[in-house]
Amino acid sequence: MAYSIKLDSFEGPLDLLLHLIDKAEVDIYDIPVAEITEQYLATIDKMQELQLDVASEFVVMAATLLSIKSKMLLPKKEEHVFQQFLDMDVDEIDPREELVARLLEYKRYKMLAENLREMEIGRNQVFTRPAENLSPYVREEDHTVTNVTLYDLINALEKLVKKTKEKEPMTTVSRDEISIKDRMTEIRQAVRSGGMVRFSELFTQGATRTEIVTTFLALLELMKAKHITCVQNQLFQDIIICENGTEGAHTDGL
């Protein structure tokens, strides 16, 4: 009758050591090296019996544990001579000290990784919805024509750039670049011919980032020269661009 043995997967030798220490319910600051070493070697033997690849780092840790075990089994007098032979500090406190420090550091990182994983799971369970148009809930008397600030223009530009990202054309057609000065002339002509023009109408469908930025800078230059005025009739509505001094006539009823 066939049977299978399941072994826990470990990310490395320190992960395996922590598992054995937790399973044995021993103090990490006072590791019973002989007992843990036997369990560690037995686990590696099982991995090899199951024809699992045992990374070299597991073997290195096994050698480290055996070295610590041998030091702790030596009588104090012989240990003193052994340390002198290896030119080591005879006042070494505990051969387990370095291993304990590595285990504690690994345990901290493991706990942090687990916390981040839980936060990611929690965030994936949160769903947000897009912003709503709140203009129907604004009091009628607040729907006054106001001068548009640079902040309002930047917000409108960000929305256009976002739409450009979402609707990138499948093919790109090269166009002749237009200067800011030429774009200023085009905007003034559009305003004069129609009496006014909406902000969104200045940006044709499929406009490139360069064209969007050029148009935006042209608008700023025209506002700076006081050739045009930008107004907004209601909150969240499109920005209206008209000749300076005519904004009231062109925004009534919009």
From Swiss-Prot:
Q: Subcellular location, in the record's words? A: Cytoplasm
Matching Pfam families: SMC_ScpA
Q: Which cysteines are joined by disulfide bonds?
A: none
InterPro entries annotated for this entry? ScpA, ScpA-like_C
Q: Which UniProt keywords apply?
A: Cell cycle, Cell division, Chromosome partition, Cytoplasm
An annotated GO cellular component of this protein is:
cytoplasm
Residues forming coiled coils: none
Q: Which GO terms describe its biological process?
A: cell division; chromosome segregation; DNA replication
Q: Which family does the entry's similarity section mention? A: Belongs to the ScpA family.
What this chain does, per the entry, is described as:
Participates in chromosomal partition during cell division. May act via the formation of a condensin-like complex containing Smc and ScpB that pull DNA away from mid-cell into both cell halves.
Q: How does it assemble?
A: Component of a cohesin-like complex composed of ScpA, ScpB and the Smc homodimer, in which ScpA and ScpB bind to the head domain of Smc. The presence of the three proteins is required for the association of the complex with DNA.
What is the name attached to this protein's record?
A: Segregation and condensation protein A
**Organism of this sequence:** Brevibacillus brevis (strain 47 / JCM 6285 / NBRC 100599)
Which gene does this sequence derive from? scpA
